[in-house]
Design a protein with these regions (language model features):
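Conserved beta-loop-beta/alpha segment of the NTase-like Rossmann-fold superfamily
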Residues: 1-30, 35
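Catalytic-core segments of class I nucleotidyltransferases/pyrophosphorylases
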Residues: 38-113, 120-123, 127-134
Length: 135
């Protein structure tokens, strides 16, 4: 499907319920798209929808059409020193791609995944792992 879309990058997303959406704080990246699911903007620790179950959230999976594209746009992010809380995020090079007119597709076909990208995620995982060991 990526070849058919002829995209320079892709950010697969999920919509609907996920347990981490129950808390008020936003821990993950959200995508704003046009009517053809092309990325307009990606923003970390944010939801473009008040009802977060309607937003397109990234589970942390990213596609670049080749290594040169990855290197170029990650370098642009670093050169601009665009950080959040002093950290660089793998999602943010896509904004530079969009600004350059590159096509970034945002399919919403992620049905099942485990999200362990933050220390809080890891603590939840360890908690539930220990709970299930007891049975």
């Amino acid at each position: 499907m990526l070849k058919k879309r002829a995209c320079d990058g892709a950010v697969p997303c999920y919509t609907g319920f996920h347990p981490h959406l129950l808390i008020e704080k936003n821990y993950y990246a959200s995508c704003l798209t046009d009517e053809e699911d092309n990325l307009i903007q990606i923003k970390e620790k944010y939801s473009f929808e008040k009802d977060k179950t309607k937003a397109k959230h990234s589970p942390g999976v990213y596609y670049f059409k080749d290594g040169a594209t990855l290197k170029k746009y990650c370098q642009m992010l670093v050169d601009a020193n665009e950080t959040l809380n002093g950290e660089f995020y793998a999602s943010l090079p896509y904004n530079y791609m969009v600004n350059d007119g590159k096509k970034v597709w945002v399919p919403t076909n992620v049905d099942k995944f485990c999200q362990w990208g933050t220390p809080e995620d890891m603590a939840d995982y360890l908690f539930w792992t220990e709970c299930t060991r007891r049975f």
